[in-house]
């Protein structure tokens, strides 16, 4: 079966068409600047040259029509007809408490996703637009929703509740939800295979480190604690997000800078993190380069970040009562040997120790632990699209 995976942002759309017999993509691509001038589709067949298609793309329906046209194009397409596509899997950012797993999309499911808009006002509306476009353009093809939050629905109340009046949870559903769930789920499953152990009994700490970063404690294959919270702003300092703060700082900044609540929220999401501390960039590669050239603030930003990661690993080791493995994934986790070394240095008490030669790996699955390490350190490139496709296949096969 071939499964189309769709990930819609407000003005962009990423897609992959996967052959589930081999679990590999046969085409992937990106639509940029939806609803803006200069919209473009970049289409990459697995065994061909990339195609760049410029067009007026006023909305997500037009974007998906372009994608479908590209997939069946006689020159650079990869299928003879759309009938070869058995199902569509959609990334949906927020499923609230309503969804603890991926689901076949029905009218009731759509309504529930719409009810979660206030929890993810920037993300859920374009996710919904993508689903509606596919329903219109591919009638009769089963559509599946895969939620970023679902994997974390196994967290116990003592992990997801804040120190606020309980009525705020009852009335407004204020609690920790966690994100990057699809990524954490995928790498935890791969880790069990790499360690040649069943998920049951395994204690894992998964570090998804990139422009957005989160850490998850995984026990018996289930998330029991995670660093992102009610929104993706909580937890680690990130590319442009502040991460954990004393809540009183928010009103202090509002008063000092004369900002509205929307403006201060935007500021904490887009102008803080390593960008704010370094003054250089939100891209860790640029910051590592600046540090190597003697930039003090760049070095400081990297030190704060690695300290943050180490602190969370330590606290999650406490929650798990030890760890069998620490996983590094996502752009920074997969590719920065220096960051991995900075984080693991000082975790010897956990039994974690790097083999510095093995740690040079970039973007490939590897056990980078020293032979004597009792807590393994793994690099596992994430593959959220494959995880979405596998969940979609599972639901279609269950009927």
From Swiss-Prot:
Q: Which cofactor does it need?
A: Mg(2+); Mn(2+)
Q: Which positions are catalytic residues?
A: 148 (proton donor/acceptor)
Query: Which Gene3D superfamilies does this entry report, sorted A to Z?
Result: 3.30.420.40
> Which CDD domains does the record associate with it?
ASKHA_NBD_AcK_PK
**Superkingdom of source:** Bacteria
GO biological process: one example: acetate metabolic process
Do you know which InterPro entries this protein is assigned to?
A: Ac/propionate_kinase, Aliphatic_acid_kin_short-chain, Aliphatic_acid_kinase_CS, ATPase_NBD
Q: How is the cofactor bound?
A: Mg(2+). Can also accept Mn(2+).
Chain sites annotated for binding Mg(2+): 7, 384
Q: What class of enzyme is it?
A: transferase
MF terms (GO), sorted A to Z = acetate kinase activity; ATP binding; magnesium ion binding
Q: Where does ATP bind?
A: 14, 208-212, 283-285, 331-335
Where does this protein reside within or beyond the cell? Cytoplasm
The keyword Metal-binding is assigned to this record: yes
Q: A Gene Ontology CC term for this entry?
A: cytoplasm
Q: In which pathway does it act?
A: Metabolic intermediate biosynthesis; acetyl-CoA biosynthesis; acetyl-CoA from acetate: step 1/2
Write the record's keywords in alphabetical order, separated by commas. ATP-binding, Cytoplasm, Kinase, Magnesium, Metal-binding, Nucleotide-binding, Transferase
Q: Which Pfam families match?
A: Acetate_kinase
Its EC number is 2.7.2.1
Q: Which NCBIfam families does this entry report, sorted A to Z?
A: ackA
Q: What does this protein do?
A: Catalyzes the formation of acetyl phosphate from acetate and ATP. Can also catalyze the reverse reaction.
Assembly and oligomerization: Homodimer.
Name the record gives this protein: Acetate kinase
């Amino acid at each position: 079966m071939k499964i189309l995976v769709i990930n819609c942002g407000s003005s962009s759309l990423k897609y992959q068409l996967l052959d589930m017999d081999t679990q590999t993509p046969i085409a992937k691509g990106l639509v940029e600047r939806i609803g803006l001038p200069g919209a473009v589709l970049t289409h990459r067949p697995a065994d061909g040259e990339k195609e760049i298609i410029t067009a007026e793309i006023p909305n997500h329906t037009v974007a998906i029509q372009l994608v479908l046209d590209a997939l069946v194009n006689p020159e650079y397409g990869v299928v003879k007809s759309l009938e070869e596509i058995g199902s569509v899997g959609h990334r949906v950012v927020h499923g609230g408490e309503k969804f603890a797993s991926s689901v076949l999309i029905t009218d009731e499911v759509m309504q529930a996703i719409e009810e979660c808009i206030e929890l993810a006002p920037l993300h859920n509306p374009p996710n919904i637009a993508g689903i509606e476009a596919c329903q219109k353009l591919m009638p009769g093809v089963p559509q599946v929703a895969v939620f970023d939050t679902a994997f974390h629905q196994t967290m116990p109340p003592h992990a997801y509740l804040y120190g606020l009046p309980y009525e705020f949870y009852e009335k407004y559903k204020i609690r920790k939800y966690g994100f990057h769930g699809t990524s954490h789920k995928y790498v935890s499953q791969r880790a069990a295979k790499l360690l040649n152990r069943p998920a049951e009994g395994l204690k894992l700490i998964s570090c998804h480190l990139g422009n957005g970063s989160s850490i998850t404690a995984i026990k018996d294959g289930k998330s029991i604690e995670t660093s992102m919270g009610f929104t993706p702003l909580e937890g680690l300092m990130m590319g442009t997000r502040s991460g954990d703060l004393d809540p009183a700082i928010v009103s202090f900044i509002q008063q000092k800078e004369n900002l509205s609540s929307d403006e201060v929220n935007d500021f904490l999401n887009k102008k803080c993190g390593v960008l704010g501390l370094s003054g250089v960039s939100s891209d860790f590669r640029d910051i590592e380069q600046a540090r190597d050239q003697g930039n003090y603030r760049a070095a400081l930003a990297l030190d704060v970040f690695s300290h943050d990661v180490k602190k969370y690993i330590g606290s999650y080791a406490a929650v798990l009562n030890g760890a069998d493995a620490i996983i590094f994934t996502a752009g920074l986790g997969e590719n920065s040997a220096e960051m991995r070394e900075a984080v693991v240095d000082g975790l010897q008490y956990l039994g974690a120790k790097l083999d510095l030669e093995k740690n040079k790996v970039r973007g490939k699955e590897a056990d980078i632990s020293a032979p004597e390490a009792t807590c393994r350190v793994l690099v596992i490139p994430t593959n959220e699209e494959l995880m979405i496709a596998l969940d979609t296949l599972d639901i279609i096969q269950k009927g």
